[in-house]
Amino acid sequence: GGIGYQGGGCPPYIIHVIDSEWGYQHMGLIVQKFGGSSVADADKIRNVSRIITETYRRGHSVVAVLSAQGDTTDDLIEKAKEINPNASRREMEMLLSTGEQIACSLCAMAIEAMGYPVISLTGWQAGMRTNSNYSNARISRINTERIQNELDKKSIVIVTGFQGINKYDDITTLGRGGSDTSA
């Protein structure tokens, strides 16, 4: 597949056209990645939703990977420090993974309100398996069955970036820039 940028200056999103890399047989799959500034508020989420649905209307299967809104991750880190400056890495993973879940749910709700079939999935629901290196995990494998099943139902799939699950079923995060890795 190839990578293309749309937009001016620093791109608000990246589109990856995936062909056989994930084992999909059809050429119409487009994976779109949206960073935190592009989903920072309700208007921006609606704009992202329009971009996603426009791609879908053109006949493509769409998987969108979203980051947490704006400074959400930094805000969550600050809240954790207020409660426990020495919080365990596992508990930090639990907390930090929520930012992407919020963004994905809100985007799915916006797409749903526009009348399109959509489902949001966490990294682990999407089959992202990682090692146990908390806060800097690496993807060890991806089971794309759930994503493929949803695409086969003609749903738009919105996936949380930045996160997966390890062999102990603990949430892990991929570190800064992890949503790009997820895409």
Label the predicted regions:
Residues 18-183:
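Nucleotide/pyrophosphate-binding catalytic subdomain
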Residues 3, 10-12:
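Short, low-complexity intrinsically disordered segments enriched in A/P/G/S/L with frequent Arg
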Residues 9, 16-19:
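Intrinsic structural disorder/low-complexity segments
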Residues 1-3, 17:
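Ser/Thr/Pro/Gly-rich low-complexity, intrinsically disordered segments
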